[in-house]
Amino acid sequence: MNFLAHLHLAHLADSSLPGNLMADFVRGNPQGDYPAEIIDGIYMHRRIDVMTDNLAEVKEAREWFRPQTRRVAPITLDVMWDHFLSQHWAQLSPDLPLDEFVRYAERQIVPILPDSPPRFVNLNQYLWSERWLERYREMDFIQRVLNGMASRRPRLEALRDSWQDLDTHYDRLETQFWRFYPQMMRLAENKQL
C-alpha cells in the first residue's frame, strides 16, 4: 500500500491519518516521540504493510515481474494499488468523493507537520500542492512517481524499468486489486487491522 491506500484504510478504521501517513518516515519505536493516536496510526501502517506483503494475491503479482525488476516489485505494486484505488474510488467510497477526502486528509495532517520528521515535511510540500493522490489514477503519473523514486535512490534504478511489468500485466494486476482490497476495507471498518 502507498499513501492513498494507507490514508483510506486509516479513515475507515477511525485511525490517525497523520500517523498512518508518517509511518514510513519514523524508524524504530515511536513511543515518547508522538501523541498516542499518532503512535497507534504508525503501528497500524506497519501492520498493514506486513499483511499486504504476505497476501497470496500480492505474492502472486510479484512473480509476474521480470527477474531484473522483481527486487523492486513490492515498491512498484504499492504504487500501483494506489492507482487502482484512485481510479475506482467512486465505486469503493461512493459517499465521499476523492477530492473531498484528500482535502479532509490534508486538514488532518498539515497541523502536525511542525513536529514531524524533516523528510515527511518535505513530502507534504509536494503531496498536496501537486495533488498526487488524485493524480495516481493517471498511469503517466505512476511512471513519473517510479522514475522519481529511482532518481532519488540509485539502488532502486530498476523502478524505472518496472513500468514495463505494470503495462504488461495491467489487467491481471487490476483483478488482483479487486481480490484483496475490498477485504482490507472490511477489516479496517471492523477495526481488525
Curated annotation (Swiss-Prot):
This enzyme's EC code(s): 3.1.4.14
Keywords: Fatty acid biosynthesis, Fatty acid metabolism, Hydrolase, Lipid biosynthesis, Lipid metabolism
Transferase in keyword set: no
GO BP annotations, alphabetical order: fatty acid biosynthetic process
Stretches of the chain forming a coiled coil according to its record: none
Keyword ATP-binding: no
Catalysis: reaction(s): holo-[ACP] + H2O = apo-[ACP] + (R)-4'-phosphopantetheine + H(+)
Database matches in InterPro entries: ACP_PD, ACP_phosphodiesterase_gpbac
An example molecular function term from Gene Ontology annotations: [acyl-carrier-protein] phosphodiesterase activity
Pfam families: ACP_PD (PF04336)
PANTHER family linked: ACYL CARRIER PROTEIN PHOSPHODIESTERASE
Role description: Converts holo-ACP to apo-ACP by hydrolytic cleavage of the phosphopantetheine prosthetic group from ACP.
Homology family: Belongs to the AcpH family.
Name used for this protein in its record: Acyl carrier protein phosphodiesterase
Species for this entry: Klebsiella pneumoniae subsp. pneumoniae (strain ATCC 700721 / MGH 78578)
